[in-house]
Amino acid sequence: MKQKKDYYEVLELSRDAKLDDIKKAYRRLSKKYHPDVCKEANADAKFKEVQEAFDVLSNTNKRAQYDQMGHNFNNQGFNSDFQGFQSANFEEFEDLFSSFFGRRKSNRHQEDIKGEDHHIKLTISFMESVLGTQKTVTFNVKENCEKCDGTGAKTKNDIRICNVCKGNGYISYTQQGWFVSVFGKQICPECGGNKKIYFRPECKFCKGVGMVKSEHKVTLNIPAGVESGMRLKSPNQGHQGPSGAPNGDLYVDINVQPHKTFQRKGNDIFSSILINFYQAALGTIINVDTIHGNVQLKIPAGTQTDTKFRLKNKGVPYVNSPFSIGDHYVIVKIYTPQNLSNTQKKLFEQLEELEELNRKSKTNSSWF
């Protein structure tokens, strides 16, 4: 019986390789030896060998057993194998085939081959993020060349049916796992999903690519409550799909500018107000700015610095749930006056004397 090749040698890795290195090697070699791409006679065997090596080395438990026992370790355990397959391999199948064609084309949930998705970054103000807004963005997308109808050929006589996908625009694949087989369709690497290929001369407008860049303008509805790091999706606003397939989607990464007064934590707003010592001692009513407008806040007598007051439902709406709103918290800061006049100093001295008398009175009364 033929001795199995060392799994590290199969993936062309050292024995201290990191998981990211293992994944990169798997994608590279799987792409290289995939039967639909590689024409070598033993491509199928090498492809399975790469898959087997990855299945073991990408799983922490299996790898540890393999490092100790080599090919003698038991690779048939149900619990660990099934869990490892779901957490790593199944996702890697999708990543593998997306790497073949430069973009994700998995159709486990749909049969159509879509155009590429487009990603942009959008910076908005703090108030726009908490209240919602509309933004018009302009960007370039790839569309079928009108001159050659997306074929890339100079004339229709230069076009032939693709002999790889037989005019289907996609190729089928079957990926064997330990307990499941993955079936799917991927865009044809030969014709790029156009179902046809051309022979020179090429279209002079698109240089044989079949697609040209076109300026695209979209008005986006930004919901109230978004924050930095959120990604919004605008369906069918990405690059045009091949041969009439749906467009890709537009993904918008949100960046929110900071506000000079308000700070946001989750869906709550925090701000500070400055009052003087006699307002804190006697109590007062002050006006407070919120994202929803100006409101009055009652400051009770004897308020101390850093006291926090809650304004219910004056915070940020939850995204896609406008009836759920956070709160606004107001933190009080007490101002100590400087550069006192002689009159003010005398008044403070009188207050100090009264405070001292009051303290002594309380001390004496405690003896009875």
Curated annotation (Swiss-Prot):
It comes from the Bacteria. One of its GO terms (cellular component) is cytoplasm. Zn(2+) 2 binds at residues 162, 165, 188, 191. Binds 2 Zn(2+) ions per monomer. GO terms for molecular function: ATP binding; heat shock protein binding; unfolded protein binding; zinc ion binding. It is found in: Cytoplasm. Gene3D superfamilies: DnaJ domain (1.10.287.110), Heat shock protein DnaJ, cysteine-rich domain (2.10.230.10), Urease metallochaperone UreE, N-terminal domain (2.60.260.20). CXXCXGXG motif repeats lie at residues 145-152, 162-169, 188-195, 203-210. Residues 6-70 form the J domain. InterPro entries: DnaJ, DnaJ_C, DnaJ_domain, DnaJ_domain_CS, HSP40/DnaJ_pept-bd, HSP_DnaJ_Cys-rich_dom, HSP_DnaJ_Cys-rich_dom_sf, J_dom_sf. A zinc finger (CR-type) spans 132-215. Pfam families: DnaJ, DnaJ_C, DnaJ_CXXCXGXG. GO terms for biological process: chaperone cofactor-dependent protein refolding; DNA replication; protein refolding; response to heat. Keywords: Chaperone, Cytoplasm, DNA replication, Metal-binding, Repeat, Stress response, Zinc, Zinc-finger. Zn(2+) 1 binds at residues 145, 148, 203, 206. Its cofactor is Zn(2+). Its main location: cytoplasm. Participates actively in the response to hyperosmotic and heat shock by preventing the aggregation of stress-denatured proteins and by disaggregating proteins, also in an autonomous, DnaK-independent fashion. Unfolded proteins bind initially to DnaJ; upon interaction with the DnaJ-bound protein, DnaK hydrolyzes its bound ATP, resulting in the formation of a stable complex. GrpE releases ADP from DnaK; ATP binding to DnaK triggers the release of the substrate protein, thus completing the reaction cycle. HAMAP family: DnaJ. Homodimer. Belongs to the DnaJ family. The J domain is necessary and sufficient to stimulate DnaK ATPase activity. Zinc center 1 plays an important role in the autonomous, DnaK-independent chaperone activity of DnaJ. Zinc center 2 is essential for interaction with DnaK and for DnaJ activity. NCBIfam families: DnaJ_bact, PRK10767.1. This is Chaperone protein DnaJ. It comes from Peanut witches'-broom phytoplasma. The gene is dnaJ.
